[in-house]
């Protein structure tokens, strides 16, 4: 459970804590924008990433609730769902025993360039989007299909 707690601390509780730290200021000024980083994995459970997927789903739901609570005060809440982006995320991902994975996933290596991800995110935020899925066709199709049939997309994402 130690590994699961570490993942939840980084991917969920850290974003909640940061938001709670700035929220009083935003409420006082009656304006602002809070942007959360979730993941396509938070919309589609992925094999060997159960806790990561759960943490990213949790921040998505927390953001949805926050949006309902603060919208009338002029605060906008957005959630970004990156697909595969070329970063060290899989290299540093924690394995079941709490150690760094130590190698880069092929999907990450072939993912969207980090600069392109940033540009697409900023563009979507400037258009006042609240639910922002950024990735290739594969990720966007997966998100769409997961809404129609979560169990089928879950089985399709399994690796032997």
Describe each region flagged by the PLM.
Residues 19, 55:
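Active-site helix of classical SDR
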Residues 3-5:
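Substrate-binding pocket helix/loop in short-chain dehydrogenase/reductase
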Residues 156-160:
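Conserved small/polar residues in nucleotide/adenosyl-binding loops
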Residues 46-50:
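Active-site loop immediately N-terminal to the catalytic Tyr-X3-Lys motif
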């Amino acid at each position: 459970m130690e590994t699961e707690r570490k993942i939840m601390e980084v991917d969920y509780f850290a974003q909640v804590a940061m938001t709670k730290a700035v929220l009083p200021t935003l409420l006082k000024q009656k304006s602002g924008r809070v942007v959360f980083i979730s993941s396509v994995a938070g919309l589609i459970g992925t094999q060997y990433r159960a806790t990561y997927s759960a943490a990213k789903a949790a921040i998505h739901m927390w953001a949805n609730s926050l949006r309902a609570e603060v919208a009338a005060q002029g605060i906008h809440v957005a959630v970004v769902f990156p697909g595969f982006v070329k970063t060290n995320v899989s290299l540093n991902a924690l394995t079941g025993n709490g150690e760094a994975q130590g190698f880069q996933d092929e999907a990450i290596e072939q993912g969207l360039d980090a600069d392109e991800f940033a540009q697409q995110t900023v563009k979507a935020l400037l258009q006042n989007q609240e639910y922002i899925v950024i990735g290739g066709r594969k990720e966007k199709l997966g998100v769409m299909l997961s809404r129609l049939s979560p169990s089928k997309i879950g089985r399709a994402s399994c690796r032997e």
